[in-house]
């Protein structure tokens, strides 16, 4: 069933059509699904997992009898071959023992067909170790594929939210341009009325130009963010993407302690489990290497047919037991066993190093999320205060109790506060996803094929 599911996932990758704006807004789940189906590295990991499954099935075949058929056609005037052909075809006569005929036989033609069945009975544990090794490699490949899925899903989420935030930044920039244009028009009118000096009008015009320049920068960042989203999801370069508007993320719930998150990661991270599977595979390889020092016992049964033509005639049967043991192989077996031990130690140390790295990732992700949550709370309060400040300064400016530069400064602070609130919200959402990825708990869309 696992292989069937993975096959469906790979077939879906080839069949999934490119999404267009005609299908409606491009949702986050759609972006993740498209990434999982179109990402070349992920598809390669899926094929790697299928190949490992096939090798695991092949290893199990070592416990089944091996059946072979062999056909041979030969012409020879070799004395031994010629006499053996007569024996095998049961055509020996008394005249065939004449020394002259034995030493100088006529050319003999033989057609031989053999059907044999071979079954190893004891291999020193090599067959079972081979099954364990191949099974562990298959498990490691499957877990590696699932970890690739989570990493690809995070990359899609990152690109998607960044594109949404870039679109929201354009809205903020448009609002800033509209406010700056309003102030520039007001300043121009007041100059004509002689109520303010010309330098105030120029200040308002410079403020408008700065706002328009910032809007161009925001629009370019949005284009780059959409292009990055197309690249991550595997969308065509000319695909038109329509995203739903940015929605501020909810406040972060109470975080678990770093120790709890570390334990969760050590228990659930797919790459850690894959590394553990590599350790099991290398230990099985040690058992396989040790089998070279054990006797090999097997049984072979065969039916053979011999004739001067291709017909199946003159059948003979044989059955034999075989016991073999290598005495000297030039040190190959000893060196192979030593290498297997070193491979095991290497994989155990890599597992230990990965465990330490995972702990560090979880601690760093927890710290980033704590910082991002606090930063967003501050940014939200600051944005609210900046809006109220603009309202009050506008009121005072309309009453003639403050100067234009104060109003422009208040508007600029509001733009900065809104951009900071947006950046803090994006940082909080990405930090939360990074923590889930570090813990190995990042969820995928429900209909994504998994093994």
Where are the regions a protein language model picked out?
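Gram-negative bacterial Sec-dependent N-terminal signal peptides
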Residues: 2-21
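Bacterial Sec-pathway N-terminal export signals of envelope proteins
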Residues: 21-72, 78-80, 120-121, 237, ...
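DHp/HisKA histidine-phosphotransfer helix
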Residues: 24, 41, 130, 200, ...
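Small/polar-residue-enriched beta-strand and adjacent coil segments characteristic
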Residues: 25-27, 66-147, 257, 264, ...
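Periplasmic alpha-helical coiled-coil/stalk elements that build and connect Gram-negative outer-membrane
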Residues: 26, 147-264, 365-372, 414-415
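Charged, alpha-helical scaffolding/interaction elements associated with membrane systems
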Residues: 37-39, 154, 193, 268, ...
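Amphipathic alpha-helical coiled-coil segments
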Residues: 44-59, 148, 152-173, 182-184, ...
């Amino acid at each position: 069933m696992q292989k069937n599911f993975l096959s469906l996932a790979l077939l879906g990758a080839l069949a999934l059509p490119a999404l267009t704006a005609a299908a409606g807004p491009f949702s986050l789940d759609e972006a993740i699904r498209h990434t999982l189906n179109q990402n070349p590295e992920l598809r390669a990991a899926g094929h790697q997992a299928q190949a490992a499954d096939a090798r695991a099935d092949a290893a199990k075949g070592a416990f089944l009898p091996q059946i072979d058929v062999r056909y041979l056609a030969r012409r020879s005037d070799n004395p031994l071959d010629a006499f053996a052909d007569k024996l095998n075809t049961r055509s020996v006569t008394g005249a065939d023992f004449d020394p002259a005929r034995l030493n100088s036989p006529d050319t003999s033609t033989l057609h031989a067909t053999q059907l044999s069945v071979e079954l190893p009975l004891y291999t020193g544990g090599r067959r079972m170790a081979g099954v364990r090794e191949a099974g562990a490699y298959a498990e490691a490949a499957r877990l590696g594929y699932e970890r690739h899925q989570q990493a690809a899903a995070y990359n899609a989420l990152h690109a998607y939210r960044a594109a949404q935030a870039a679109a929201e930044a354009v809205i903020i920039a448009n609002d800033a341009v509209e406010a700056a244009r309003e102030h520039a028009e007001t300043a121009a009118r007041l100059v004509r009325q002689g109520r303010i000096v010309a330098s105030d009008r120029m200040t308002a015009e410079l403020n408008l130009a700065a706002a328009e320049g910032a809007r161009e920068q925001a629009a370019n960042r949005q284009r780059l963010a959409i292009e990055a989203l197309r690249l991550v999801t595997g969308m065509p370069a000319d695909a038109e993407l329509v995203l739903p508007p940015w929605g501020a993320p909810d406040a972060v719930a109470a975080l678990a302690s770093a120790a709890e998150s570390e334990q969760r990661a050590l228990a659930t991270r797919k790459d850690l489990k894959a590394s553990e599977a590599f350790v099991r595979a290398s230990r099985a390889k040690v058992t396989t290497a040790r089998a070279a020092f054990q006797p090999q016992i097997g049984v072979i049964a065969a039916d053979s047919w011999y004739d001067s033509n291709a017909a199946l005639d003159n059948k003979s049967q044989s059955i034999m037991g075989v016991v073999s043991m290598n005495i000297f192989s030039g040190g190959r077996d000893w060196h192979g066993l030593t290498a297997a031990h070193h491979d095991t130690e290497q994989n155990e140390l890599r597992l230990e190093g990965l465990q330490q790295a995972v702990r560090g990732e979880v601690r760093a992700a927890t710290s980033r999320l704590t910082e991002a949550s606090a930063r967003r709370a501050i940014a939200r309060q600051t944005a609210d205060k900046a809006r109220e400040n603009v309202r009050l300064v506008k009121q005072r400016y309309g009453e003639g109790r403050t100067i234009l530069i104060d109003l422009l400064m208040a508007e600029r602070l509001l733009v900065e506060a809104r951009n900071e609130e947006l950046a803090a919200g994006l940082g909080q959402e990405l930090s939360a996803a990074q923590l889930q990825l570090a813990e190995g708990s990042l969820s995928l869309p429900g209909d994504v094929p998994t093994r």
